[in-house]
Design a protein with these regions (language model features):
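Surface-exposed cleft-lining segments at the edges of enzyme active sites
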Residues: 6-13
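Active-site-proximal beta-strand/loop segments in catalytic clefts of secreted hydrolases
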Residues: 3-4, 66
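Histidine-acidic metal/acid-base catalytic patches
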Residues: 15-121
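Conserved beta-strand edge residues that scaffold enzyme active sites
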Residues: 4-6, 103
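Short beta-strand segments at enzyme active-site cores
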Residues: 1-3, 99
Length: 121
């Protein structure tokens, strides 16, 4: 289940804080029901991304990237430090994929390659 922000993009979306999603996972009670942690959305709603990832790692099954503000490239024009975030994700033991989910304002293939380089820690 993917958490989205209700502040900018998805007004009135129910799952807009990680803790809400974690509580839902506990209620469902299945090891097959987990969270998709969208770093862009959760930065907007709650910040403290690295601490949240570490705290709730057992409930997260997948990650999405995206620059903030604007959900554009993950480069030095936005506020998230993706090398540090990805190192924290790796330190949790996560072995899955990191989805590059952003809206490029430059050449899409160049932006995607840049995203891979930034996240290759």
């Amino acid at each position: 289940m993917e958490g989205l922000n209700s502040k900018v993009d998805h007004k009135d979306y129910m799952y807009d804080y990680t803790k809400w999603g974690v509580e839902l996972c506990k209620l469902v009670g299945s090891p097959r029901f987990k969270l998709l942690y969208d770093i862009y959305h959760m930065q907007i709603m709650e910040g403290d991304v690295i601490r949240t990832i570490r705290q709730y790692k057992d409930y997260i099954a997948h990650y999405h990237t995206g620059g903030n503000p604007g959900r554009h490239e993950i480069d030095d024009t936005q506020e998230l430090n993706y090398p540090a975030i990805v190192r924290a994700i790796v330190a949790t033991g996560y072995k899955g994929f990191l989805g590059q989910e952003f809206i490029p304002v430059r050449d899409p293939m160049e932006s995607l390659a840049q995203g891979f380089r930034i996240c290759d820690v």
